UniProtKB/Swiss-Prot annotation:
One of its GO terms (cellular component) is cytosol. The gene is gltX. Pfam families: Anticodon_2, tRNA-synt_1c. Its cofactor is Zn(2+). Zn(2+) binds at C98, C100, C125, D127. PROSITE patterns: AA_TRNA_LIGASE_I (PS00178). It is found in: Cytoplasm. It catalyses: tRNA(Glu) + L-glutamate + ATP = L-glutamyl-tRNA(Glu) + AMP + diphosphate. NCBIfam families: gltX_bact. GO terms for biological process: glutamyl-tRNA aminoacylation. GO terms for molecular function: ATP binding; glutamate-tRNA ligase activity; tRNA binding; zinc ion binding. This is Glutamate--tRNA ligase.
Length: 469
């Protein structure tokens, strides 16, 4: 039997990291077993579902590279199918119409609460004969009485629920709209889902869904309920812990490889290995290796992984993701080096692509002023002679190459009998406007000959003015 999994988010908000991890685990379960992965949008909550949220979910999945084989399916486009099954269940007696008013249900719950009883429907309409009336009604599933529902969860082991603890679930509201728990069952059945991977908050839904599947004569899928993600303070992860939307991480400068690597390790492990490519994830992933304890989100670990991938992935690939940040920061690339060359130069120091983009501006744009603190420290009177001499040596170069530039800087220090720092720091501030950059040879090479010479002249003028003031 072909393994078939699904990711079924509700479009009531953006794709958050908890949902992304569930999607990743479900995707890996399919890919690790040469199976199929289905994307389904569970939009039966019509009032809260939005197109913007749906678009954001698809954008997040595409950015992460979690491709799907079927879908996206939308539940709101399948209402005819759900109503067809409900009609069959009413005819077979596995569902019934409930005419209890809201007032009666509220009074029942209040009485049960006052008596310390579990709050559930009492089956008032369960065995009543059919009515020919215009009274409003809901449709309820006739849950089995007695016995229990047992399933073996890939993460949590054997789980058992007493049927007597379950009430007769509403499967269609008074307006005729089918409910979430019912739609999920029909969808999983129709789509041939063999393994359901979802959050632990759905555990209580599982016995109800299994009972409906049994009533329909449908196969029961396997289940894996993964634990929630906590903030570093032990509380449930929320906006106050920082970015929680997947695309916010894109905006903050993280690579999808870093986020995927971080998320897969947030509850799953393979020995002591920390770095996993997608291919390695597919090779090693098993649902049974997921830890059932909650996992704490650690931003420092994510930053570390992001640094690793910025440095280790092909510069040309990193540049495709960096392009978004260059556009976002309005850095015009038309007058400067190839972006992949800048990635190669700056990758060693960069924590995020957002930082990398900001620190690359001087390769493409001239700066109006030198950093005040750096100029005060390095563009003093003693910098005049080194700047003038290095300018002469650079101007004399036949070829503008990294090697030739390096030799010119080194020759300047030798001729003046000073350390490289006495030449390098004033030169760095001169050409970048700041105090940090990659090696000066590659920095000047990427900035270009004409622009480098202009900036050195500007720095010489700045130092001369300070001497004369």
């Amino acid at each position: 039997m072909t393994t078939k999994t699904r990711f079924a988010p509700s479009p009531t908000g953006f794709l958050h990291v908890g949902g992304a991890r569930t999607a990743l685990y479900s995707w890996l379960q399919a890919r690790a077993n040469n199976g199929e992965f289905v994307l389904r949008i569970e939009d039966t909550d019509i009032e809260r579902s939005t197109q913007a949220a749906c678009d954001a979910i698809l954008e997040g999945m595409n950015w992460l590279g979690l491709t799907w084989d079927e879908g996206p399916y939308y539940q709101t486009k399948r209402f005819d199918r759900y109503n067809e099954i409900i009609a069959q269940m009413l005819a077979k007696g596995t569902a019934y119409k409930c005419y209890c008013s809201r007032e009666r249900i509220d009074a029942l719950r209040e009485a049960q609460a006052a008596n310390g009883e579990a709050q559930k429907y009492d089956g008032c309409c369960r065995d009543l004969p059919a009515r020919d009336t215009d009274e409003p009604f809901v449709v309820r599933f006739k849950n089995p009485i007695g016995g229990s529902v047992v399933f073996d969860d890939h993460v949590r082991g054997r789980i058992e629920f007493s049927n007597d603890a379950l009430d007769d679930l509403i499967i269609a509201r008074t307006d005729g709209v089918p409910t979430y728990n019912f739609c999920v069952v029909v969808d999983d059945w129709d789509m041939g889902i063999t393994c359901v991977v979802r959050g632990e908050d759905h555990i209580n839904n599982t016995p109800r869904q299994i009972n409906i599947l049994k009533a329909l004569g449908a196969p029961i899928p396997e289940y894996a309920h993964v634990s929630m993600i906590l903030g570093d303070d032990g509380a449930k992860l929320s906006k106050r812990h920082g970015a929680v939307s997947v695309m916010q991480y894109r905006d903050d400068g993280y690579l999808p490889e870093a986020l995927l690597n971080y998320l897969v390790r947030l509850g799953w492990s393979h020995g002591d290995q920390e770095i996993f490519s997608l291919e390695e994830m597919k090779q090693y992933f098993k649902l049974g290796d997921i830890n059932k304890a909650a996992s704490a989100f650690n931003t420092d670990k994510l930053v570390w992984l992001n640094q690793h991938y910025i440095k280790s992935l092909a510069p040309e690939y990193v540049a495709t993701h960096l392009q978004w940040h260059m556009d976002d920061q309005e850095i015009d690339l038309s007058n400067g080096p190839a972006l992949a060359e800048v990635v190669t130069a700056l990758a060693e120091r960069a924590k995020t692509l957002k930082e990398l983009a900001a620190s690359s501006r001087y390769f493409y744009e001239d700066f109006a002023e030198f950093d005040e603190a750096q100029a005060k420290k390095h563009l003093r009177g003693v910098a005049l002679e080194p700047l003038q001499l290095v300018q002469q040596k650079l101007a004399a170069l036949t070829d503008w190459t990294v090697e030739a530039i390096h030799q010119a800087i080194e020759d300047t220090a030798t001729e003046l009998d000073v350390g490289m720092g006495k030449v390098g720091m004033p030169l760095r501030v001169a050409v970048t406007g700041a105090g940090q950059s990659p090696g000066l040879d590659i920095t000047l090479f990427l900035i270009g000959r004409s622009r480098s010479e202009q900036r050195i002249s500007k720095a010489i003028e700045f130092v001369a003015d300070r001497i004369n003031s």
